[in-house]
Amino acid sequence: MLIAWPDRVHCCEIMLQEGARVVDAVEMAALNGIEQAVGYAVFGVLVTSDHVLNDGDRVELLRPLLIDPKEARRRRAVSA
């Protein structure tokens, strides 16, 4: 389980039953900041909360974007 916010990063390993879903992993991890997650990914691929996990999967909690990536690039290009 991986959660990476601007002010902190937390990674933990949890053991689940075979057939466990993303939502089961999230509940089991009980990390601070989970309520801010707007989505989930497994190894960088978007998944739903009912996605069945495989042994060794890395579940990532996704945070909301603060700014549109295209707009951020435009701003950096202007200031460079």
Swiss-Prot record:
The lineage of its organism: Bacteria, Pseudomonadati, Pseudomonadota, Gammaproteobacteria, Lysobacterales. Belongs to the UPF0125 (RnfH) family. It holds the Pfam family Ub-RnfH. This is UPF0125 protein PD_1376. It comes from the Bacteria.
